[in-house]
């Protein structure tokens, strides 16, 4: 048995271990679309807020509910798109969408998101709206950092960027919507585009 064959065998074993323990079917296109959804949602929210300022007789509770449903709509669209595109990519790569890797990834991602979601609901209940945008960015970034162990390692850079942006948003209070657009909109589009190029380069190397 020559040295090159041994190295090939080791490489194949590492690949199999990665496939079983990591979720490698994230789609760059889902990141781009999530960014577009976020920008569209933020634009609609901006219009609603400006309309409320113009017509101050409107009940603030109505505005709160409208903004809440806009956020939920963006979240549902983003998650649905990510699940669909990841499923199609996993099917193409013969990877189990509900395998050990995806379970590890989901648990690591959802734990900070659920904790952050509960914290944000408490902020809403206490009517502390000014730090909601920074809080969403920070908890989302932490979720990506935790989940990066179980997927493409490069996702941790997006996580760091989201956390830092959230801290900046906490410092520059009153510009939450702008930071939200940058973090959930433009950062997602940039990262999704880079992920597509990264995956194409990997495919070329493996050919």
Where is each model-derived feature located?
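Terminal transmembrane helical module of multi-pass membrane proteins
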Residues: 140-207
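Helical transmembrane-bundle signal
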Residues: 35-45, 75-82, 113-117, 137-140, ...
